[in-house]
């Protein structure tokens, strides 16, 4: 994932070329780099910021198409570009147009706060996920991969006046239930890969991490692997 959020994460064409060439040379050819259909996968975190930095949708489309071609020319088979779906309501954003116009191959989310009111019980948020996944699977013209979060609490980062809500009663059992719903989605849709995005490995200051702690031990990691949720 290219996390080019502020401070000043928007980049012009020259810097974009430099950064993406470094990705090609240093990362995409690594044998452990994740691929779909043989192509390295890159998720764009902040699409509006990217478009602003590259001076509009048309020039961004040209830059991304050239990026894909450079990946192909480097013997990488091309590039699988993934768009992060963010605050989509079907009316006010143009993400449904961007997905096709900019040449994205799939989309997913980064965390629950982008799609739902997070200031409530985890179970209530999880119950809303399958209908949203179904809607997005047909609305954008590209495959949608489901996303599951551990929770949300970024209050350690801010004064009390800037807190954005806290997910209540998140626990490994509810996380496992959400993973099972995501697996059901993947099992029943014709996707180019069996991919579920999880937030996150180590976002301690956002209250969404898989790593073990004193409160739940290895509970979240066991929900992913030890209980056989995802299978093979």
Task: Locate predicted features.
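Glycan-processing catalytic domains of CAZymes
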Residues: 1-232
């Amino acid at each position: 994932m290219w996390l080019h959020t502020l401070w000043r994460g928007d980049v012009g064409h020259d810097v974009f070329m430099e950064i993406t060439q470094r990705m090609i040379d240093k990362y995409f050819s690594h044998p452990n780099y994740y691929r779909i259909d043989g192509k390295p996968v890159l998720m764009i975190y902040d699409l509006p910021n990217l478009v602003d930095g590259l001076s509009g949708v048309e020039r961004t489309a040209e830059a991304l198409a050239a990026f894909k071609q450079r990946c192909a020319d480097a013997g990488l088979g091309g590039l699988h570009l993934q768009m992060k779906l963010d605050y989509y309501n079907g009316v006010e954003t143009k993400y449904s147009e961007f997905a096709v116009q900019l040449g994205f191959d799939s989309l997913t989310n980064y965390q629950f706060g982008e799609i739902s009111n997070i200031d409530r019980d985890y179970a209530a948020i999880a119950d809303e996920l399958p209908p949203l996944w179904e809607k997005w699977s047909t609305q954008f013209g590209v495959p949608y991969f489901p996303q599951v979060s551990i929770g949300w609490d970024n209050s350690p980062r801010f004064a009390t006046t800037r807190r954005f809500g806290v997910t209540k009663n998140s626990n490994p059992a509810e996380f496992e239930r959400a993973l099972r719903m995501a697996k059901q989605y993947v099992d029943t849709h014709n996707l180019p890969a069996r991919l579920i995005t999880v937030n996150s490995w180590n976002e301690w200051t956002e209250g969404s991490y898989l790593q073990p702690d004193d409160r739940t031990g290895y509970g979240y990691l066991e929900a992913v692997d030890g209980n056989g949720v995802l299978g093979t």
